[in-house]
């Protein structure tokens, strides 16, 4: 809990309430496996919280296939400056997410029941996040239409991150992305560190919303599109 306190700071009590809800209602409703309860903090909450290092200040974030709220709710807890939309098509999951948002009093979060394809053209977000939703090749097709020009997809990936990025090359080229990057965040806080694939959307200059970029995470590897 020492690392959790460092990561969440004054928001730790809110994170603790969320962890308790995940470990009870989340398991009962099939959103979290029973074996995950003992490792909720390291494998799920802290693993997601460190993603905040890669998110610009005051960003509008859409969490695609939010499920139990990972990473969307965690980001909302640790970064109250963010405005987060939890995008989830299944009713039982949106019900769970709505209960979480109300219980934790997260005024910077909205829950939207829809598929990404259904809201393409309606959303123009700064950042899209996704965890364990789909291979990057498919995820990019869903996420990029939800981003403003110059917006970023931050996909939480495992050991196949580099391979998925290579496999998604043709799709990313088709969508005219500006660049891609592999990042590792949370070194020293989670083992292994959280691996992100960052994809920068193409389009106009930047949609009129210039933002101060966060410091590049240690261990990042940049690629050109």
Regions found by a protein language model. Give the residues of each.
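Class I SAM-dependent transferase core
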Residues: 1-62, 77-78, 92-109
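Flexible, active-site-adjacent loop/turn segments at secondary-structure boundaries
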Residues: 29-30, 38-39, 68, 131-134, ...
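Residue-level recognition of conserved structural "scaffold" positions that shape functional pockets
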Residues: 37, 72-74, 165
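Conserved beta-strand/loop positions that form the S-adenosyl-L-methionine
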Residues: 64-66
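Conserved SAM-binding loop of SAM-dependent methyltransferases across substrates and taxa
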Residues: 68-81
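S-adenosylmethionine
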Residues: 79-225
């Amino acid at each position: 809990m020492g690392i959790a306190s460092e990561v969440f700071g004054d928001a730790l009590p809110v994170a603790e309430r969320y962890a308790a809800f995940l470990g009870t209602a989340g398991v009962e409703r099939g959103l979290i496996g029973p074996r995950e309860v003992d490792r909720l903090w390291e494998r799920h909450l802290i693993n997601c919280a460190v993603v905040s290092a890669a998110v610009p200040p005051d960003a509008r974030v859409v969490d695609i296939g939010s499920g139990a709220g990972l990473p969307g709710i965690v980001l909302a807890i640790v970064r109250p400056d963010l405005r987060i939309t939890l995008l989830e098509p299944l009713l039982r999951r949106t019900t769970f997410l709505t209960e979480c948002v109300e219980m934790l009093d997260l005024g910077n979060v909205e829950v939207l029941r829809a598929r990404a394809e259904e809201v393409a053209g309606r959303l123009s977000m700064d950042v899209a996040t996704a965890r364990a939703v789909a291979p990057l090749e498919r995820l990019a097709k869903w996420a990029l239409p939800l981003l403003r020009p110059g917006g970023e997809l931050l996909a939480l990936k495992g050991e196949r991150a580099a391979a998925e990025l290579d496999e998604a090359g043709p799709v990313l080229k088709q969508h005219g992305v500006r660049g891609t990057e592999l990042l590792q965040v949370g070194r020293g806080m989670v083992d292994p560190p959280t691996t992100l694939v960052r994809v920068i959307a193409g389009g106009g200059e930047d949609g009129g919303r210039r933002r101060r970029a966060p410091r590049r995470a240690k261990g990042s590897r940049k690629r050109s599109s």
